[in-house]
From Swiss-Prot:
Organism the protein comes from: Pseudomonas putida (strain GB-1)
Entry function: Functions in the N-end rule pathway of protein degradation where it conjugates Leu from its aminoacyl-tRNA to the N-termini of proteins containing an N-terminal aspartate or glutamate.
Enzyme class: transferase
Short name of one Pfam family: ATE_C
One Gene Ontology MF term: leucyl-tRNA--protein transferase activity
Family affiliation: Belongs to the R-transferase family. Bpt subfamily.
KW Thylakoid (keyword) present: no
Protein name: Aspartate/glutamate leucyltransferase
Keyword set, alphabetical order: Acyltransferase, Cytoplasm, Transferase
GO BP term, pick one: ubiquitin-dependent protein catabolic process via the N-end rule pathway
Domain of life: Bacteria
Protein's gene: bpt
EC number: 2.3.2.29
Annotated compartments: Cytoplasm
Length: 235
């Protein structure tokens, strides 16, 4: 473990919760003057922290603990029947790793995805600046995994490659290809990639029981949830 006790953190003032509309949220951030060290990041991921842009954060709400960090233990994951069908359905896709960069091809896919799937969220309307600030960061552990069908870009999974696992930062994909379930396939691929690289887990971010958009995360079993500072397995 790195010397986490020496790190500085800052809590925000209460603000509107992005997931539960009737709640106020407080967020704890790692001091932005602290260099984005991959080992610090890995240790903090074990404690439920996530990355957004250049910042590491986790919920720090006084009266709510609905945001539960979730990860998939790669070596113990067993795909169910539906997930096996998704893998078969997308066997014609090729995946390549690229360094983070702004490309019109990326942004156009991201724009269509946000406008179609998340027009009710705080990421709408999408812009080039927003896309770059959120995802295009010059970090040595960040990768854009491109999913293509005969050269056509179908999805991009933005992932952080950590010593203890893959952290799924964000995935955007072709919104008109519903039958392929590209978002679910991207997670299945990341589990396979974690196994290939002998990594422990795929970190999915936060699961919220009363948020329908989060329900998909518990479809991957077993899954581990960080409860009372312990990773608890849900089979």
């Amino acid at each position: 473990m790195t010397e986490l006790a020496r790190l500085k953190f800052y809590a925000t003032q209460p603000h509107s919760c992005s997931y539960l509309p009737d709640e106020q949220a407080t967020t704890l951030f790692l001091d932005p003057s602290q260099p984005m060290d991959v080992n610090v990041y890995a240790d903090l991921s074990e404690m439920g922290f996530r990355r957004s842009g250049d910042h590491l954060y986790r919920p720090h709400c006084q009266n709510c603990n609905a945001c539960v960090p979730a990860r998939i233990p790669a070596a113990r994951f067993i795909p169910n029947r539906q997930q096996r069908r998704i893998l078969k359905r997308n066997a014609d896709l090729t995946v390549t790793a690229a360094r983070p960069a702004f490309k019109e091809e990326y942004f156009e896919l991201y724009r269509r995805y946000i406008e179609t799937r998340h027009a009710d969220g705080d990421m709408y309307p999408p812009s080039r600046d927003q896309f770059s600030t959120f995802l295009v960061r010059d970090l040595p552990f960040c990768w854009f995994y491109e999913f293509r069908l005969e050269g056509h870009l179908m999805a991009v999974a933005v992932c952080d490659l950590l010593p203890n696992g893959l952290s799924a930062v964000y995935t955007f994909y072709e919104p008109d290809e519903e039958r392929r379930s590209l978002g679910r396939f991207a997670i299945l691929w990341q589990i396979t990639e974690a196994l290939r690289q002998d990594l422990e887990a795929v970190y999915l971010g936060y699961w919220i029981k009363n948020c329908k958009k989060m329900n998909y995360k518990t479809q991957y079993r077993p899954i581990e949830l960080l409860i009372n500072q312990r990773w608890v397995t849900l089979n």
